[in-house]
Amino acid sequence: MRLPEAVHLPVTDLPVSAQAINATASRRSMRFIDEFRDGELARGLAAAIRQAARPDRDYRFMEFCGGHTHAIARYGVTDLLPPNVHMIHGPGCPVCVLPIGRIDMAIRLVREAGVTLCSYGDPLRVPASGGLSLLKVKAALGRDGNLRGDLRMIYSGADALAFAQQHPERQVVFLAIGFETTTPPTAVLIRQAQALGLRNFSVLCCHVLTPPAIASILAATEVRQWGSVSLDGFIGPAHVSTIIGTRPYERFAEEYRKPVVVAGFEPLDVMLAILMLIKQVNAGRALVENEFSRAVTRAGNHKAQHLVSEVFELRRSFAWRGLGELPYSALRIRQAFADFDAEQRFAVRYEAVADHPACECGAVLRGVKQPQQCRIFGSVCTPENPIGSCMVSSEGACAAHYSFGRFTDAAPSADADFPGSPQASG
């Protein structure tokens, strides 16, 4: 396989090769994934990072997106970095940031309102109150004749809409989660339901927004009171940025003097973004740069943005796991589409619930702790038995570290005093 043009550049010239790599990828659309995982180019980028990183200082960069967290763990990117370059995990996993109270709302819709709840697979496994989860509720439905509801795992919101059309006798609720990437498809579903005149379809909207979460990491008192982490810059999310563009991040560069580099999900994307951030920090600059130019523009997707603004509006406040109540950080369904708002149709309300006291998921989401610093990581809390939401999704920091061998330094005897552990139960 012929390497991208960038591999033929001297190591010191690699920072300017983002355009060359993206151009090469665009010309070879069927082969570019292999090129973005090329070992020789990765070694060149690793050497460039080592050369650029000043030995007299530390660099602390947050990858906001769970997809980047997954890629960093899967490809061992941190093993290629010098010891003074640190990657901090952020709150960019949509399943992870859902608070327990939101899962409880979905459970009440099933158990009390008797709806058919349609959800992606990961939310079904998120721990809720009383040791429950949506998956455990689904298992109980077949045993308890008093429960009228139903739970179905789907791969697309369109599956929920189709199910509602096929079963007009059932009230079907779609559990809509995610950042700006998944919001436009939900808007399409609601518009389609309105056009079809469906009276048995509604959405439990849990869509959240990226910029307010980044702002909370940098400035919110809700985060400061729990402790936060000093950051030198951000790797901006890839898919989110295809929708909102790079313009919303300019505020963080201008107001907080934090550089942002939007990057793709491949290992070379991430490594190049780290190198670009180091170069900015060394030069005392704070700019928004776009490494992912093959898919992201400054303006983003205007059509998707217009669709979202037509169907949704800002919530005054929304509770995030680990970050608390953040103002104007999530979306709700506009009054014009209120017939399809499950919160209004079934009068279900959010009730705050504290996380498990042994779980450090909130601290991991704020960047205060690494997964291995949680005393139950890799022992009591595993992907098969998640105690916190960060161990549920493959984009969660804890699940990513566990799945790709980053759990070897988990705290010894972590489960010794944990209720319900094999040692505790004898």
Model regions: which residues?
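Residue-level detector of structural "landmarks"
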Residues: 18-19
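Metallocofactor- and cofactor-centric catalytic cores in central/energy metabolism, strongly enriched
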Residues: 27-169, 183, 187, 195-196, ...
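Flexible, glycine/charged-enriched surface loops at secondary-structure junctions
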Residues: 58-61, 200-201, 284-293, 319-321, ...
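Phosphate/pyrophosphate-binding betaalpha-module
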Residues: 175, 179-248
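A conserved active-site cap/scaffold subdomain adjacent to cofactor or substrate pockets
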Residues: 224-297
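Internal helical hairpin/lid segments
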Residues: 271-363
